[in-house]
């Protein structure tokens, strides 16, 4: 069991639901207390009155894939990791390769699709489906999440953060209510 933290501005949940994860996430993200504080600061910019929570969670990860900090980047980095793992797979790679090629083609065409420009909710639905399919491909390869050195939110004191693929891997064991202003001051310290 790994103890990690999650910063959120949502007050309406006490357990995680992968189906409701923010649209551009392949899984649910957890890290150090500093990373959770940094995430809250990112969500709220200069809004010092925002109520936020830092959740203390226990994660159950059996076989996470170690990756670079790819989560502040485009899908291209996730596809590169997937392609590398398909190449290493001990199972026949052809079914994974076909699915990978299909997902990559759909993703590459998404930005040029005029339907998405006219209907952002359609684009969000597309991305949610893409994330779901990417998550399932990594699960079929035997992984239940990612572990990565969080350079974006932990800064110079970069530490491991985690991305889990199934909400049943997460138990919320505590929470701390914070005002963004207090969180920001602690984060800068």
Identify what each model region corresponds to.
Residues 1-189:
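Active-site and NAD+-binding cores of ADP-ribose-processing enzymes
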């Amino acid at each position: 069991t790994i103890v990690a933290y999650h910063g959120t501005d949502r007050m309406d949940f006490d357990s995680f639901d992968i189906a409701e994860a923010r649209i551009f996430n392949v899984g649910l993200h957890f890290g150090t207390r500093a990373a959770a504080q940094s995430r809250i600061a990112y969500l709220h910019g200069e809004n010092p009155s925002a109520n936020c929570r830092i959740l203390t969670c226990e994660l159950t990860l059996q076989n996470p894939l170690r990756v670079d900090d790819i989560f502040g980047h485009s899908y291209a980095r996730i596809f590169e990791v997937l392609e590398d793992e398909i190449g290493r797979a001990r199972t026949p790679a052809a079914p994974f390769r076909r699915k990978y090629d299909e997902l990559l083609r759909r993703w590459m065409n998404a930005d040029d699709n005029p339907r998405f420009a006219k209907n952002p909710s359609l684009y969000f639905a597309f991305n949610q489906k893409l994330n779901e399919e990417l998550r399932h491909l990594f699960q079929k390869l035997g992984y239940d999440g990612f572990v990565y050195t969080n350079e974006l939110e932990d800064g110079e004191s970069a530490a491991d953060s985690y991305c889990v693929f199934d909400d049943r891997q997460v138990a919320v064991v505590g929470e701390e209510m914070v005002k963004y202003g207090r969180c920001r001051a602690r984060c800068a310290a």
